[in-house]
């Protein structure tokens, strides 16, 4: 299974959630609403989830093993950093 596309939508509001991401696998299957969160130990991803009646959050879709989670997280955070850096460069050029 290959990650063939990662689309990042940055969140403008202040807070721990930095972006919402869609990831396409093998140009055939997409998972939307993966969140990029800033935690105490740096950035991490949170898979799409829903709130149960008792207030608990359950993942809708998620990797089954650590290796796959790390692969997805690496691709998402890499693309997030690119988007973040591109916007910083654009903002600096506008200010000059």
From Swiss-Prot:
<protein>
    <recommendedName>
        <fullName>Putative septation protein SpoVG</fullName>
    </recommendedName>
</protein>
<dbReference type="GO" id="GO:0030435">
    <property type="term" value="P:sporulation resulting in formation of a cellular spore"/>
</dbReference>
<comment type="similarity">
    <text>Belongs to the SpoVG family.</text>
</comment>
<dbReference type="Pfam" id="PF04026">
    <property type="entry name" value="SpoVG"/>
</dbReference>
<dbReference type="GO" id="GO:0000917">
    <property type="term" value="P:division septum assembly"/>
</dbReference>
<dbReference type="InterPro" id="IPR036751">
    <property type="entry name" value="SpoVG_sf"/>
</dbReference>
<dbReference type="InterPro" id="IPR007170">
    <property type="entry name" value="SpoVG"/>
</dbReference>
<keyword id="KW-0132">Cell division</keyword>
<keyword id="KW-0131">Cell cycle</keyword>
<keyword id="KW-0717">Septation</keyword>
<comment type="function">
    <text>Could be involved in septation.</text>
</comment>
